Each structure stands twice: as C-alpha cells, then as structure tokens.
Curated annotation (Swiss-Prot):
Organism superkingdom: Viruses
Quaternary structure and interacting proteins, as annotated: Homooligomer. Interacts with the replication-associated protein (REP). Interacts with host proliferating cell nuclear antigen (PCNA). Interacts with host retinoblastoma-related protein 1 (RBR1), and may thereby deregulate the host cell cycle. Oligomerization and interaction with PCNA are necessary for optimal replication enhancement.
Protein known as: Replication enhancer protein
Xref: Pfam families: Gemini_AL3
Gene source species: Indian cassava mosaic virus
Keywords: Host-virus interaction
Length: 134
C-alpha cells in the first residue's frame, strides 16, 4: 500500500523492474535491532531493513521504499555475520534473476531466509512505499 495516498500498489507497479546491471549498488542493508534470546526464548529476533537507493527508486518510479523484515531464528549469529551473509545471498539471487523489482526482492528474501539460512522460524514483513505522484 502506498503510505502517502493509502492506495493499493497494483501488480504492474510491484512487478515493474529494471535490469540489475543498470543500477550500481541498488540496495542498502541495515540491521535495525538484534535481540539475543529475549524473555528466555530459544530464538534470536533480528530486524533487517532494506532500502532502495536513489537510482533504483528513480528507475522504478518510487519516491521512497523501505522494507523491514523481522526474523525469528534458532541460530545465534553475530550481527555483522548475519548481515553479510544475508546481503550477499539476496544480491546473488537477484543477480541470477537479472531483474530487480519490489516482487523480486520479496522473493529473494524469502528464498534466502527459508532455503539458504537454515533455522528461520518465521518472518514478519513491513514496508514503507511511496510512489511518485506526478
């Protein structure tokens, strides 16, 4: 959903993509929070934020685009190591597809968390997407 207007994002807007080699450094990855075994749980909770860079947003017709993924995992990774593996694997998946869009990023994250990084229990996604109005 567009955060400014409240309108739903159409399938065409979500699938609108650009070749990955046309945009250098298309994504910015950041770990927002890492809770080590909170409340005597047997899981770590890691919140990862993916931001689209200016050139990618311009190519896709977006004003702003952030995706937050809250990951519950039974692994006990170091924060920097989890981020490095996550970023590398997401970019590797997108490079194999050749196209980067909102949908392909969600598919790449799902692939990495459930097929590459073992120990993922569940993932919650939230996003902030604002389309260009003009």
């Amino acid at each position: 959903m567009d955060s400014r207007t409240g309108e739903l994002i159409t399938a065409a807007q979500a699938m609108n993509g650009v070749f990955i080699w046309e945009v250098p450094n298309p994504l910015y990855f950041k770990i927002i929070q890492h809770d080590n075994r909170p409340f005597v749980m047997n899981q770590d909770i890691i919140t990862v934020q993916i931001r689209f860079n200016h050139n990618l947003r311009k190519a896709l017709g977006l004003h702003q685009c952030w995706m937050d993924f809250k990951v519950w995992t039974t692994l006990q990774p170091q924060t920097w190591r989890f981020l490095r593996v996550f970023k590398t694997q997401v970019l590797k998946y997108l490079d194999s597809l050749g196209v980067i869009s909102i949908n392909t990023i969600v598919k790449a994250v799902e692939h990495v968390l459930y097929n590459v990084i073992h120990g993922t229990d569940r993932v919650e996604q939230s996003n902030l997407i604002k389309l260009n109005i003009y």
